[in-house]
């Protein structure tokens, strides 16, 4: 833009921003270009010819993943290669946290183990299926693959899972419209029997993160997959998070009995209130209720939608006695990681002077009764609605979480209520953006800006929620001018902003939150050649907060297709007409170099050369055992393959037939032997009897 036009542009932009309308060009950069590309779209545009769109097959072809030979250990070694984009590295680590929260699968940096997963920036997004025992097993997170559910999807392949729609019973649930599929891509819709992949007796899952979308490999604009239950037509192909059935299958496959970082969840639906106890060190008690006259009218878990259910814990402050306290303590918990996050919803129907204190009671050898430590004091609690709170803990000994309600002075008609408590060994989000009356905003087709926030490094930022589209919701991250700008490094280097639309399911393990991350690359330039992440006062536009304070807002960076409005209205994103967006901005500059590897490196080529002369039959897979190539043969519950090349098939039925035949044969032989023995014995005694008779006759003759 010509320099003499710049002041007029600022005036015009300021007018639009103040009026609540978007600035020219919305002053944002859409990293998706307005197109919500799935994994298979990305790979197709790159011209990749991968099995089922994102699976790398070994030379032996499609292998069965039935049997323990194809499982990884519960802790999987990995390397993040330096070729990966910085944003992708951070997203991968966040995906690992989702695995830890919901399964017993863990990940550790490679330290010389025989087999490990090497994550690199290849062409597209793809993985092998199962542990192929190749030493270095590659998994590609290429350009535009740096979305958390995409990473989860590819690692599920590596853990041994095929796509949901290829399972043996899929024709009972979906219809494949073959004439709408791209020519030459029909094989991506093949169906496979239980000898190749096992559904683990879990129902067909329309919501699986491993399912194709309805538009997969289409040759036009019409759907290639039609669900037999029409309500799931726009559900299949979700790329937000694991579904419940995804987790059930994964936990069954790896015999998980618990998840690694999850600690506790309580919605107070059961009378035992999740093992929580009333303290003896207070002057009142918390009560389990489903409604309070002064509010809340219903719990947060069910929002009054389920009859005879919907409970929360309530501390009554209407007595008017200032300083009255009630302490509710969790069951004893045992930490493993040294950091935890407590999440809960709080409702204030009393006076503004009431407060909630969150403590930990930590038990050590020297303090058998526990040491009470204040972790957070919550004052000035808004009244009339449920509010979400997070409390960060750093506990290393066994402990309890303690909720203390404190009544304020003066008259009060209500009290404090808590519901939907979750405790996990994860990092709490840094900030919460609570948007109320969201349905009204959604219908207004407007752009909404968050309040200003600060990152842990001191950078000021703002989030832009774009509701102007009738079908999609956009989400953008802006740096803004702040109090620390003179002391900060510019252009802003390697700050990763993670923005999460919260699925408000009461149990953190059952959520399918929608998340997107972007990272500030200090070398990234804008269309006019200026650094995108430079100081906002230098490259931004003038804007105003609602109170009239002026500031500078840098260009937004994000996506116009963050989520469809249809998905936004599903699950529990929108609850009580409230939406929560969780925000974390952290420095990931330490991830610049991650590929240092120790000792001798097992190479894929050695394994492939050894197996190149071996052809395993019937879905067997070639592996190295002490340097020798051997076929690992697939097996099911009542069948198996055997032999040097898995060329022979055995089954329980065959074994029974053989066993019965052998038994009959042995019985027949024994019977024959017995009959012969009896015959010979009888013949022997007949001869003796005949000889004795002859002797007696001779004696009688001599007597005469």
UniProtKB/Swiss-Prot annotation:
The record places domain MATH at 431-585
CDD domains to which the protein is assigned, alphabetical = EGF_CA (cd00054), MAM (cd06263)
Return the annotated site residues (Mediates preference for acidic residues at subsite P1'): 239
Covalent S-S links between cysteines: 104-256, 125-145, 266-428, 611-622, 616-631, 633-646
Establish whether keyword RNA-binding is in the entry: no
User: Where does the entry say this protein is expressed, by tissue?
Assistant: Kidney, intestinal brush borders and salivary ducts.
Which residue positions are annotated as catalytic? Answer: 154
Q: Where are the transmembrane segments?
A: 655-678
Provide the MAM domain boundaries. 261-430
Co-factor(s): Zn(2+)
- Cytoplasmic side of the membrane: what ranges? 679-704
Alphabetized Pfam families for the sequence: Astacin (PF01400), MAM (PF00629), MATH_2 (PF22486)
Q: What does this protein do?
A: Membrane metallopeptidase that sheds many membrane-bound proteins. Exhibits a strong preference for acidic amino acids at the P1' position. Known substrates include: FGF19, VGFA, IL1B, IL18, procollagen I and III, E-cadherin, KLK7, gastrin, ADAM10, tenascin-C. The presence of several pro-inflammatory cytokine among substrates implicate MEP1B in inflammation. It is also involved in tissue remodeling due to its capability to degrade extracellular matrix components.
Task: Give the protein name, as stated in the record.
Answer: Meprin A subunit beta
Taxonomic lineage of this organism?
A: Eukaryota, Metazoa, Chordata, Craniata, Vertebrata
- Gene coding for it: Mep1b
């Amino acid at each position: 833009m010509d320099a003499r036009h710049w002041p007029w542009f600022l005036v015009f932009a300021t007018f639009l921003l103040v009026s609540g309308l978007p600035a020219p060009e919305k002053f944002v950069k859409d990293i998706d270009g307005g197109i919500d590309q799935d994994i298979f779209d990305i790979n197709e545009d790159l011209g990749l010819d991968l099995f089922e769109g994102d699976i790398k097959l070994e030379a032996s072809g499609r292998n069965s993943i039935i049997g323990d030979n194809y499982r990884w250990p519960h802790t999987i070694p990995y390397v993040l290669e330096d070729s990966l984009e910085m944003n992708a590295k951070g997203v991968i680590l966040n995906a690992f946290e989702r695995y830890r929260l919901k399964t017993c699968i863990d990940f550790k940096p490679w330290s010389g183990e025989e087999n490990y997963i090497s994550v690199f920036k290849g062409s597209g997004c793809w993985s092998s299926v199962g542990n192929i025992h190749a030493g270095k097993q590659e998994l590609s997170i290429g350009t535009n693959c740096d979305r958390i559910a995409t990473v989860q999807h590819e690692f599920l392949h590596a853990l041994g899972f095929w796509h949901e729609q290829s399972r043996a019973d899929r024709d009972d649930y979906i219809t494949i419209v073959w004439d709408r599929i791209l020519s030459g891509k029909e094989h991506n819709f093949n169906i496979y029997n239980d000898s190749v992949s096992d559904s683990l007796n879990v129902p067909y899952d329309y919501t699986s993160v491993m399912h194709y979308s309805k538009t997969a490999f289409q040759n036009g604009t019409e759907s290639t997959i039609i669900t037999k239950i029409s309500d799931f037509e726009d559900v299949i192909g979700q790329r937000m998070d694991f579904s419940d059935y995804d987790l059930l299958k994964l936990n069954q496959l790896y015999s998980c009995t618990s998840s690694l970082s999850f600690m506790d969840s309580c919605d107070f639906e059961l009378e035992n209130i999740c093992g929580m106890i009333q303290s003896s060190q207070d002057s009142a008690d918390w009560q389990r209720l489903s409604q309070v006259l002064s509010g809340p009218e219903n719990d947060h878990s069910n929002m009054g939608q389920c009859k005879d259910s919907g409970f929360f814990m309530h501390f009554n402050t209407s007595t008017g006695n200032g300083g009255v306290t009630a302490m509710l303590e969790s069951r004893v918990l045992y930490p493993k990681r040294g950091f935890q996050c407590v999440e809960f919803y709080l409702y204030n129907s009393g006076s503004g002077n009431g407060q909630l204190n969150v403590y930990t009671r930590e038990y050590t050898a020297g303090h058998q009764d526990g040491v009470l430590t204040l972790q957070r004091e919550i004052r000035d609690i808004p009244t009339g609605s449920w509010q979400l709170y997070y409390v960060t803990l750093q506990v290393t000994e066994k402990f309890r979480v303690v909720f203390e309600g404190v009544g304020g002075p003066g008259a009060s008609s209500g009290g404090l209520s808590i519901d939907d408590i979750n405790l996990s060994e994860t990092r709490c989000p840094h900030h919460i953006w609570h948007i109320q009356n969201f349905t009204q905003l959604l219908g207004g087709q407007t752009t909404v800006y968050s309040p200003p926030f600060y990152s842990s490094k001191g950078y000021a930022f703002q989030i832009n929620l774009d509701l102007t589209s009738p079908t999609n919701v956009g989400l953008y991250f802006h740096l803004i001018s702040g109090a620390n700008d003179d002391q900060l490094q510019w252009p802003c280097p390697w700050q990763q902003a993670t923005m999460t639309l919260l699925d408000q399911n009461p149990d953190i393990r059952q959520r399918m939150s929608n998340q997107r991350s972007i990272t500030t690359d200090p070398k990234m330039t804008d269309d006019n050649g200026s650094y995108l992440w430079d100081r906002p006062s230098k490259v931004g536009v003038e804007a105003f907060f609602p109170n009239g304070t002026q500031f500078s807002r840098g260009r937004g960076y994000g996506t116009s297709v963050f989520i469809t409005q249809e998905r936004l209205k599903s699950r529990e994103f929108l609850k009580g007409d409230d939406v929560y967006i969780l925000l974390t901005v952290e420095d990931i500059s330490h991830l610049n170099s991650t590929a240092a590897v120790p000792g001798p490196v097992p190479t894929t080529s050695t394994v492939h050369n050894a197996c190149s002369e071996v052809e395993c039959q019937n879905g067997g897979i070639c592996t190295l055992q002490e340097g020798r190539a051997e076929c690992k043969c697939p097996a099911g519950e009542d069948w198996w393959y055997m032999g040097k090349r898995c060329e022979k098939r055995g089954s329980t039925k065959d074994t029974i037939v053989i066993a019965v035949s052998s038994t009959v044969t042995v019985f027949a032989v024994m019977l024959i032997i017995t009959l012969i023995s009896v015959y010979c014995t009888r013949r022997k005694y007949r001869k003796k009897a005949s000889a004795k008779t002859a002797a007696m006759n001779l004696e009688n003759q001599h007597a005469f």
